[in-house]
Amino acid sequence: MQNKLGTVRAISGDDPALREGAIGLVRPDERAEAHVLFRALWVVTSALLLLAITAATCSVAWEYSTRRYVKGFSDAIVPSSSAPEEKVDAILHWMSNGPARLDHGPDGSIRDPTETLNYASLLKVCGTATNAFVNLADSAGLSSRRLLLLDSNRRTMHVVAEVLVDGRWIVVDPVFRTVLRDSAGRTVTRKDLTNRSVFLAATSGIPGYDPAYTYDRTEHVRMARLGGIGSFLRVAFGRLAPGWEDSVTASLVLERESLATMMGAVLLMMALVLLRIFLRWYGVRRLGVYPPEMGARLLRAWSAYFDSGAGV
């Protein structure tokens, strides 16, 4: 670089002016690249949000339809003015002596009450029989949840239900169509059934009951099949909502596919809305970019469509 005398002055690599100029030369390309990446991410997020809104709308309609369907069943089976124990007996009586149903249904892992209520084969499997019972009990105004009986390896060997009656979670076995009772005829809880004598008195009179189905190891929510992710989710949910495993809502979500789908779609939609809010803040504050609003784009597309139609 020449000074006023025409001599050449060497510029050090650490010269602040040189460093400033170099940054100024690179910054436009980096900013342009960041703008392109930001706009692409914005478009993808907006598209996913539209899909999530559509999924949430469809799942809400599905859950509403399922709820109406199960409510119709419970209204026809359970007298609304009955006591809680009478409602339980009415549901079990219907499961045993209800109208003829189709013999062969889907596999036993299904969790859709519109299916489990209509196939005799599904009402003979502990998982789907409990699914039908829990959904009918919920529609009849009872607080009910499923209970998993585990073996020594923590694997599920049987599924029953618990119903809140007079402040106690009494045990009901839907597949055997019975309310478990002790030798005096009193209803029993899960804790009561850990007593060997009470367990034998409650189950010895049930035809075909496997004595291995004990209540020594039980869970309401089984997440071990998810491996490490299941353990992480259990800990995370436990910190966010202590006692969530014992809640009626958690059990109902697991026993009704439409409700689980609806909650998943709504949570995804909320997460994408929050992501768009963050992206908009980042674009405006950090990049100086104002992303176009989805509503404004749709309005322009709508107007252009009608303008082209009017021109024709």
Question: PLM ranges: what are they?
Answer:
Residues 2-25:
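N-terminal intrinsically disordered, acidic low-complexity segments at the extreme N-terminus
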Residues 131-201:
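Hydrophobic/aromatic-rich core segments of domains that either
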Residues 54-124:
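Secondary-structure boundary elements
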Residues 29-62:
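Hydrophobic secretory-pathway targeting helix
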Residues 34-42, 247-269:
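Juxtamembrane/start-of-transmembrane alpha-helix segments at the extracytoplasmic/lumenal side
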Residues 270-301:
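Juxtamembrane interface at the cytosolic side of transmembrane helices
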Residues 46-52, 256-282:
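Selective detector of the "anchor" transmembrane alpha-helix that sits immediately C-terminal
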Residues 176-247:
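Extracytoplasmic/lumenal ectodomains and periplasmic regions of secretory and membrane proteins
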